[in-house]
Regions:
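Hydrophobic/aromatic residues within well-ordered alpha-helical segments
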Residues: 12, 19, 23-27, 50, ...
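Hydrophobic alpha-helical connector segments
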Residues: 18, 22, 32-60, 115
Length: 156
């Protein structure tokens, strides 16, 4: 019944945001777990690995790609919590990776926002429709662009 629904959710958008947050948190949880099993020599390698792992998961599940990409706003992303990892936020994963590098960055949240939005926007058509290039071609360019963004925001 409609009344029962509102005991758990504010409105239909609340349930959608919670579903998106749940699915997105699982993507990041898997990517972070896989990243921890590997060894990297640079911050760039870690970030690129994390991003590529998420992209590969979305490529394997196109329905999830459609659902998440159309509805994942920055406000939702920046507050997604990963319950299997002590309820940390997805943003905390990025903060931890950046902190481990012992490098300083200006406007970290803006930098992460730009990476997330770049990847989300550019992968949509490539994953779902195979245009304007293959996913492997796009990932090669994204890798360079992500490294460039990290360099651009680094404080010397």
């Amino acid at each position: 019944a409609k009344g029962t629904f509102y005991l758990y959710f504010k409105d239909k958008y609340d349930i959608r945001h919670r579903l998106i947050a749940n699915k997105a948190s699982r993507l990041f949880e898997r990517a972070e777990e896989a990243m921890r099993k590997e060894e990297f020599s640079t911050l760039e390698e870690k970030v690129v690995f994390l991003v590529n792992h998420v992209v590969d998961q979305l490529n394997e599940n196109k329905a999830l790609m459609r659902f998440i990409s159309k509805n994942l706003s920055w406000a939702v992303f920046s507050h997604i919590r990963i319950s299997n990892m002590g309820n940390i936020k997805c943003m905390d994963i990025f903060d931890e990776i950046l902190g481990e590098s012992n490098r300083k960055f200006r406007q970290k949240e803006l930098m992460i926002y730009m990476i997330v939005e770049l990847v989300s926007a550019s992968c949509y058509s490539v994953i779902l429709y195979g245009t304007p290039c293959s996913l492997e071609e796009l990932k090669a360019e994204l890798d360079k662009t992500i490294c460039g963004l990290l360099k651009q925001f680094e404080v010397e």
